[in-house]
Amino acid sequence: MGMLEARELLCERDERTLFSGLSFTLNAGEWVQITGSNGAGKTTLLRLLTGLSRPDAGEVLWQGQPLHQVRDSYHQNLLWIGHQPGIKTRLTALENLHFYHRDGDTAQCLEALAQAGLAGFEDIPVNQLSAGQQRRVALARLWLTRATLWILDEPFTAIDVNGVDRLTQRMAQHTEQGGIVILTTHQPLNVAESKIRRISLTQTGAA
């Protein structure tokens, strides 16, 4: 039994099958990239794995239990960062981290922002930051969260090369400590092929 399991997932949109019979099992320490052409259903799959959407058939299990039966404990173990940063634009970068991580002290939040490349921008309202900086505010949570499972939809969007390298290193550290990372990205990952598992979406499931 793996940590996270997709079992015979079917997803249809507008009378079109995105994928069917999609099954896979993820274990502690795995780093997974979901691949596929535009419109293949990558974001849709991530939303199914987070429990935000339901498949047309099949189920997702966490530690052997269907998500709907363990929703609270699952979400305590999950960090989801989607296409939209999901941050409060009227708050500062530092206030955003305090909002999402109420048990984190100011020093920890400042360190997380520095790791994300936002040193010197802590007290600026998010609506005054660039798109890339706003993305970094959301991604700074990677240095604070205690969640086991990270699901990240295009985390490198609007991030420069140095930022991508820093984020990649943080993901590597998380998986080395037994965490799981699932992501989509159009950018090449500067990681040894042996460290990345790729699940390619096709209409008949995963290739």
Curated annotation (Swiss-Prot):
Record Pfam families: ABC_tran
Keyword ATP-binding appears in the UniProt entry: yes
Membrane protein topology class: Peripheral membrane protein
GO MF: ABC-type heme transporter activity; ATP binding; ATP hydrolysis activity
Gene Ontology, cellular component aspect: plasma membrane
Major location (coarse): membrane
Catalytic activity: heme b(in) + ATP + H2O = heme b(out) + ADP + phosphate + H(+)
SMART domains in alphabetical order: AAA
Binding site for ATP: 36-43
Subunit composition and interactions: The complex is composed of two ATP-binding proteins (CcmA) and two transmembrane proteins (CcmB).
Record function comment: Part of the ABC transporter complex CcmAB involved in the biogenesis of c-type cytochromes; once thought to export heme, this seems not to be the case, but its exact role is uncertain. Responsible for energy coupling to the transport system.
Identification of the protein by name: Cytochrome c biogenesis ATP-binding export protein CcmA
Protein species of origin: Escherichia coli (strain UTI89 / UPEC)
